[in-house]
């Protein structure tokens, strides 16, 4: 019997699920808004909430734990330097899930998962150029 089992399996092994949520969390932190299936968005939310709470702590051990989870130092840098100060006063609830209709190919429910007070100008390559220019101006 499957009583008390909280998370979905997504027809993947444990290692594949862990890697999938690590990649989805990294994409969400990078872009601050992603479109994915509704079940993945619902299971991604606690992963990202825990990472932001970890970043709010801000110590070296928390940073190393985040690197172990996300596997990318640049994403962890954004998490600790941009998102943690933004949500310093918020006691949880850093993300929202908005239903986004159904996918054409297989009619699965889609959803947008985003940060609550996200930067609406953070979009793709233009955002990388914008943040790089801002960092360069700050350094000069």
From Swiss-Prot:
GO terms for cellular component: cytosolic large ribosomal subunit. This is Large ribosomal subunit protein bL17. Belongs to the bacterial ribosomal protein bL17 family. Transmembrane segments: none annotated. Keywords: Ribonucleoprotein, Ribosomal protein. It comes from the Bacteria. Gene3D superfamilies: Ribosomal protein L17 (3.90.1030.10). It comes from Xanthobacter autotrophicus (strain ATCC BAA-1158 / Py2). InterPro entries: Ribosomal_bL17, Ribosomal_bL17_CS, Ribosomal_bL17_sf. Pfam families: Ribosomal_L17. One of its GO terms (biological process) is translation. The gene is rplQ. GO terms for molecular function: structural constituent of ribosome. Part of the 50S ribosomal subunit. Contacts protein L32. The keyword Ribonucleoprotein applies.
């Amino acid at each position: 019997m499957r009583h008390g089992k909280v998370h979905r399996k997504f027809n993947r092994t444990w290692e594949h699920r862990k890697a999938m949520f690590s990649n989805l969390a990294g994409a969400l932190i990078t872009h601050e808004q992603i479109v994915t299936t509704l079940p993945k968005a619902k299971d991604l939310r606690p992963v990202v909430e825990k990472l932001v709470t970890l970043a709010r702590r801000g110590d070296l051990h928390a940073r190393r734990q985040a690197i172990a989870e996300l596997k990318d130092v640049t994403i962890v840098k954004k998490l600790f330097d941009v998102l943690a100060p933004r949500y310093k006063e918020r006691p949880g609830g850093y993300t929202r899930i908005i239903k986004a209709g159904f996918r054409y190919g297989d009619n699965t429910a889609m959803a947008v998962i985003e940060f609550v007070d996200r930067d609406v100008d953070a979009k793709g390559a233009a955002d990388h150029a914008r943040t790089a220019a801002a960092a360069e101006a700050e350094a000069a």
